[in-house]
Amino acid sequence: MQRLKKLAGVLAMVFVVSFLFSGCADASIAERRQDTSSTLYTGYVGTSFPTSFMPWLSRDGIAPTVASMIYNTLFSYDTDSGTYAPLTAKSWCYVDLEGQPLTQDQTFQTANDNEAVENYYSTRKEDYMAVRIELYDNVYWSDGEKLTVEDVYYSFDLATDYALSNHAGALAWTADLKHESDGRKLVTQGMFTAKHPDLSGTYGILPGEEDTVMYFLVNKSFGAVTTLFNTILILPEHIWEPIVSSECQLNSKNPQGELLKRYENPVGSGAWILEKDETNTQVITLVQNPNYHLKAQDGSALYKVDKIKILLYLDSNTAIFALRKGYIDILDSAVSSNYLNLLSGEKDIFVSNAPGNGISCLVFNVNPSKPYDSGMKMLLQDIEVRKAIALAVHQEELIANVLDGAGKTASAGLISANDELLYEPQADILSGPVEERLIEANAILDERFPDKDESGYRLYNGERIHFQIVTAAANQDLVSYLQRQLQKIGIEVTLQAAGSTPETTYLYNSNFDMTVQSVILSMANADVMYKAHFVTTERSSNYGKIQNEELTDEINAMRKTLNQEARIAKIHHLQVLTAQQYYKIPLYSSNVLSVARTDRFTGYVVSDGQTVFNNETLKNLVQVTGE
């Protein structure tokens, strides 16, 4: 109780001192209290808001959230059913090389028959499969132009054309698409529409389908469609095609003229439209798109608020105090577990304690590249050293003290035990009594580094073995407890502040010893993320640049198999292989804690891995009327 009183006092003091320096200093802090409209006041904690909204520009901060509200992908992924849910496109299916559907009833409108797909394509010498998609016929851009398959073709073609896009990430998104352009010149055609036809006539577009039907050729992998379907935001061709060139690339750090105008005035097909006149560096305002094609079951608007105002706060304390005082309705930022007990008992406060879908890992730099291939980090190339450090990590202690219990332990295979289909118990090699693990860890290190200094830390060439963990300052508690745990095996670690661009500054170029990374592996993303985490070494999630032939071969085999049972079996085996590398060491799977007020809106939905500011919440909100 004393701790809660102190925390509440700190919040009050911080709010009084810092509100004038927050992102909302020039806005009326009482606006929300007096507003009776269907406007959702949303707080966000960050250092700044973007001033431009090119959808592929950034994955940092609020930018991807706003982009995904203004623009749409082809589909969204439904984790409950394990299927792609309609969004811009209403249906898809695999077809054979004559264009005939490989579905359960041999029509274009039913689910894929995976056995038929396997039987057909396993016998073909071609290195690709064909996919048919069909768009909704009533999708419009926010400027009134109709969205057609030509917009999809343009977006994906641009993503393969680095000379025009200047976007390395887009090349990764389209890596499984058998299509390529270079400087607006077609190199390989792997997409077909009415205006970009298949000259062989195999993938023909029938009369009436010109705007809605197209075909892709993709690598022989069930995961090949993943990033095409739910990662690439579709761009309006009529907006970007006249502007983008090799001299005026889509992804620009210094946009000028017409390009800057388009960055600042996005034209999207999503459920929300940017209200430019009410948007600045401190507030982002989105209004509901009245012509959005997806509706609720009763025919009403899919989302239940008319406007969303996102307000910037520079720190969590100020944002939480603003929520408690009624200046905002909801936070689109996870809050520390320190606030859980404080907020749970407050009137008109809804606390979302959602299970996380990511596993926080301690990642080792196992294969540093020049010029950073020196120093203590080179010791991490020894798999036994990595194993010793992994054995010393005490997840239960971290969960109890860093997360205040709001989390769960994770397997070294990096897939949750709750995933009944994929979880492999034999990969859980870092569980068991911590005392026994410490004995084993010290035995390993005693053989390699028997000498210690006066503080009990191990020595290498006369110097204390010390590693820096590149991570956000918010992880100070985590690093402090890791210091205590690794001290028990004579290893010293300290925090190195990650800054605002850790990937560019440290991680991509090997300028680090260890880092903290969230890993999410699932049936939906296995093809993409196993490769990103454990194979690709350039600008990928494989920060430590691990290269293991057996692991790489098994990942490639998993990606290429068209038999679902064999694919699942290989994912089980991959968990064992990745665990045995002692490369990404599980720390915990933390819950996502977030908060909202219930005096203006109710109907908040707790969604795994997300804050309470999520799509399902926006679909279910009910405005409170009366006193």
Model-derived segments and their meaning:
Residues D78-D80, N230-L302, K307, L438-I439, ...:
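Gly/Pro-rich hinge or "lid" segments in bacterial periplasmic/extracellular proteins
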Residues E258-Y263, Y292-L342, E492-T494, G499:
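Ligand-site clamp/hinge motif
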Residues G43-T123, V267:
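N-terminal lobe/hinge region of extracytoplasmic solute-binding protein
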Residues G169-Q249:
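Surface-exposed binding/hinge segments that line
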Residues V283, S360, A390-A427, A474-Q483, ...:
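Detector for C-terminal structural segments
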Residues W272, K408-D453, T471-Q476:
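Structural transition elements
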Residues W92-W173, M378-Q381, R386-A388:
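Aromatic- and charge-enriched surface segment that lines or borders ligand/interaction sites
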Residues G43-G46, S165-G169, E275-V287, L311-Y372, ...:
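Extracellular/periplasmic solute-recognition and catalytic clefts
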